[in-house]
């Protein structure tokens, strides 16, 4: 009883010392972590001491203002409009791992948002009407249980990340009245019922998705650069596929005239601006006299030509068709006067000058922007489904940036949707126009179920476009990682087997078409899902067009897909490099882990790792996983010579399929 009597005084003494700041680290270690989190947050976010959070007042922090607990843990913290002024410090509220609702609206908090990734149970986050700044908080993208996100009326800047689609449970998303710029991502949250991005600096066409189509123009207002059918605002005709649609200079236009001096095919000569009227009149008179002289000279040349032609018809002079005079003609020409000999020479020079001018005109005309032809490939030649003008007018949505260029989704005025890849001019400058055309004629003719077909290509003035079919089902990377929780299991192994076979068939087709053809950039982002969710390779055979010696550094995942022999070298990829990348892809399929997180171990150790990543007990589909793991390990050996060919890989996969079918047909299993 004596101990129970003194215990409250003991705690009161401790709390008094903590509130006074004596030995904070020692006493904080004696407090519940949630209480420490609140006090730490108050120390930087409540500079005006509006919150009476003090352990001298009451030890039960669950009764503090705005706090709600469940089983001794804080699950709600609502401090809206309480006059907070300060900054949201890191390692404070992030300790509240049971927090469901966090509301700090209508205060004067400033600075960036700290790392909130530890709030794994957070469902509602209200940070509106403060002075927060910086980029969109990246840690928010990992809060997969989040349903309400409101960060409006702050000073956030930069782009809205496309990874926001990972928050697939969102019902409310309010980003209005910040400083966000760039394009609007293609949001696809099926439960989203409240959405607002008004009052930002967003630009480009608003993606027409089932989610965004639910909202009217009020959700997008005060973004002058936005356009599209959702807000009924026409987009500018300028095509995003070129750095500039008006690059014409005086040297590029025909006959030395600028593009601005052309009007409906007629060349308009601008008047010469002078300061004195007398000089202007003199120029006019001089020009008239010169023109008259040219006319007279032209008439003389015509008469001379007719006379010579008459004499040639009479046998006086007849040149050899090959340009070589016969002996009698040479003797005759030597007896002719210089005037007679000069006439055919003068006439010949005039024709040569005409031909030279025609060639110069044609070469100059080819340098006019947009004068290049849109070249269709394969069976698309006879179809001609669209023109270059239609592509230039198309509304475009940025899909991504790759190692060789930028990819857009283009919606043409006839509602046809295509994918346009604009190649990086700096990286492909080493390839001449003729070499590019020859290569595209070969690659553009490749047709296989597991290849995204190249429909057409275009090049002019250093700009190069490649047009593919559009695949709305997205990439294999999105299927594997996408909006799935990091705790979700990887794809079912039968799906892995089917996808692996599709990819192997596509690679084998490329390799057997020509020994010079390789994919060169195989990874999950370059594999698209077809109409029946078959795997289709894209961006194939483009690495040969780039300058490998000046390649920019890859991200860790892309680098992990590269074979060791080319990872830090300027060597060109080979078919065995594709095989290596295929082995990496199998492990990404089986484990759901990015390529940069794959270990490099012996096959039996790799099987243990795969099984651990899939959270499967030993013996569960063990034989099948073992065969798949062994195939991946063979593809991923360091020595290129020891790697199998894609034909051998296909046989391995078919053996796995046959083993599966035999087990499924066994009546005793």
Curated annotation (Swiss-Prot):
Any Pfam family: LRR_1
Spans traversing the lipid bilayer: 284-304
Basic and acidic residues bias locations: 351-365
Membrane topology: Single-pass membrane protein
Domain annotation Protein kinase: ranges: 393-669
PANTHER family noted in UniProt: LEUCINE-RICH REPEAT RECEPTOR-LIKE PROTEIN KINASE PXC1, PROTEIN KINASE DOMAIN-CONTAINING PROTEIN
Name by which UniProt lists this protein: Probable inactive receptor kinase At5g67200
